[in-house]
Amino acid sequence: LMGGYEIIDLASLLIDKRLVKRLGGSNWKTDRIEAANIWAKEHGRAPFEISEIQWSLAHCTPRTWGDDTLVCMTEEERMWYEKQNMPVMCFAPQAKGLFSKLLAGKEETLSTTAKRRFLTTENLALAPKVQALCQRLQVSPAAVAMAYLTSQKNPTIAIAGSSRIEQITETLGGADLTLTEEDLLFLQS
């Protein structure tokens, strides 16, 4: 595993040549980002300014993904991003439609991959909370899942993919939805 300082040093060449303006990392834990950024500051180099990791309302782990190189958001990591106000690009923000399918009574339509990654006791216990927010706010589960990310204190970008127009419509249907601090705490409790 190449050290963060080595990557910062090499990436600085791209900035010096004006090939890129800013640096970001994918699947880096916050302690590695922090160490690289400290080194960058001490050596007059550009720091990492954005991170891309797996983050969704649905809890998952590298083990459930079957990929120990993957970084999934944890509460400790989330607090670091919030404190640093560092933007996070969140991949798989809809957890393969987990809450939309669960709340529609279509658990059987979840793919084998979705079941392995996201169909956990913890996420099943979260489904009634998602449903309660959907009913109170009159929005879809997809809207709640996206708003959970975009309502965080640090900037977030949810990288949502879809295979059908209906999925895009459902995801974007709550694009302007902002959850309150109380809503976020309700989902996290």
Regions found by a protein language model. Name each.
Residues 1-188:
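Beta/alpha (TIM)-barrel catalytic core signal, keyed to glycine-rich beta->alpha loops juxtaposed to Asp/Glu
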